[in-house]
């Protein structure tokens, strides 16, 4: 009798091989797809990192895309000046030059959302004049006492260019623009052989409960903290320190049952603003156990340790970087290092190392 395989056995073997090959293809595809969850409290810099990824890996913004940021930039700029003028009333800080009152009325007459391709000339003139007023400058110095957009000074300093009839937003203008993220946004980038799927979720408190269980299979979590906000209060609850809120959120994510095997990359962000603030706003006023004075390195170490010490899992890796999300050169360097970490983590998760 022949010892050849029966038709049934051949079909069974072929099916097994096809299943094995499909599993292998799935593993390879999984290896080439990186799912990254961007987390952090509101205004920590998550959306800025996504914009940097576009600049670094997709060649930047087209003319049409830059055009689309004009209204956001105009609205951010006008709204920031309005916030300062309202704060001057509540803090009882007068204008140095009362002739500026005309410009104040111009600002208050503007809608919340500025529409159009050009900032009205009278609005540009009003912001330029008010920004030079000592009363406005004094109020700006006290911005930790109210809620002011981080980019206010940048836009005010550049108001002549922004208000020009032929204005076209540059990379920095776009990076510093601010729109509150609500819900979950997914952005995809191709980096080398890898496809990055980056999920950005709303940072404000009301957004958080919606998403946590949806992402237990992510490759890694990129968690951002605005360390410059150590002396500021939450937008949603002006009794809670922003840094304390970030620590609470990091604790809940780092030790969540959904993310036990997930590595975390921690960006301690806005180091430029942090460095400026330390000499004028003592950290000890907000964190009494801090003993480093206005020494930048000591303050960085203190904050780093406060976050890393929350990790309750010995096997969980936390990779840390001090960052300035608006600095494209620095973010390009940091993201290259992050890419190496993520590749290793992904190979581990796929069972390939």
From Swiss-Prot:
Segments of this protein annotated with the region G2 motif: 173-181
Keywords recorded for this protein, A-Z: GTP-binding, Hydrolase, Lipoprotein, Magnesium, Metal-binding, Myristate, Nucleotide-binding, Palmitate, Transducer
Biased composition (Basic and acidic residues): 7-26
Annotated Pfam families: G-alpha
Essential cofactor(s): Mg(2+)
Lipid-binding residues (covalent, N-myristoyl glycine): 2
Highest taxon of the lineage: Eukaryota
Spans annotated as G4 motif: 265-272
Region (G5 motif): 323-328
Domain G-alpha: 32-353
Region: Disordered, residue numbers: 1-26
General function of this protein: Guanine nucleotide-binding proteins (G proteins) are involved as modulators or transducers in various transmembrane signaling systems.
Name of this chain's protein: Guanine nucleotide-binding protein subunit alpha
Lineage of the organism: Eukaryota, Fungi, Dikarya, Ascomycota, Pezizomycotina
């Amino acid at each position: 009798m022949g010892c050849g395989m029966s038709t049934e056995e051949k079909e069974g073997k072929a099916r097994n091989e096809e299943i094995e090959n499909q599993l292998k293809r799935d593993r390879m595809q999984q290896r080439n797809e990186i799912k990254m969850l961007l987390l952090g409290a509101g205004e920590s810099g998550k959306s800025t990192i996504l914009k940097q990824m576009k600049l670094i890996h997709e060649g930047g913004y087209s003319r049409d895309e830059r055009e689309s940021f004009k209204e956001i930039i105009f609205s951010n700029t006008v709204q920031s000046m309005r916030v300062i003028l309202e704060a001057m009333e509540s803090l009882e800080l007068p204008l140095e030059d009362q002739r500026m009152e005309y410009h104040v009325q111009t600002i208050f007459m503007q809608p919340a959302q500025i529409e159009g391709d050009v900032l009205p000339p009278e609005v540009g003139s009003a912001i330029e004049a008010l920004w030079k007023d000592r009363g406005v400058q004094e109020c700006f110095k006290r911005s930790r006492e109210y809620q002011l957009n981080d980019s206010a000074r940048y836009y005010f300093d550049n108001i002549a260019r922004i208000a020009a009839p032929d204005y076209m937003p540059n990379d920095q203008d776009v990076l510093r623009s601010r729109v509150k993220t609500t819900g979950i946004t997914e952005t995809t980038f191709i980096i080398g052989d890898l496809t990055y799927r980056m999920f950005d979720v709303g940072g404000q408190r009301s957004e958080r409960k919606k998403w946590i269980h949806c992402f237990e299979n992510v490759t890694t979590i990129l968690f951002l903290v605005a360390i410059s906000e150590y002396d500021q209060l939450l937008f949603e609850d002006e009794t809670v320190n922003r840094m304390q809120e970030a620590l609470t959120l990091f604790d809940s994510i780092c030790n969540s049952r959904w993310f036990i095997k997930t590595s975390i990359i921690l960006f301690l962000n806005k180091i430029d603003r942090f460095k400026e603030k330390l000499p004028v706003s003592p950290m000890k006023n907000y964190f009494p156990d801090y003993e480093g004075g206005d020494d930048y390195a000591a303050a960085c170490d203190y904050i780093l340790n406060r976050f890393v010490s929350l990790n309750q899992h010995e096997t969980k890796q936390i990779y840390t970087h001090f960052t300035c999300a608006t600095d494209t050169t620095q973010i390009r360097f940091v993201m290259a290092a992050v890419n190496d970490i993520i590749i290793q983590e992904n190979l581990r998760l796929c069972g390939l190392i």
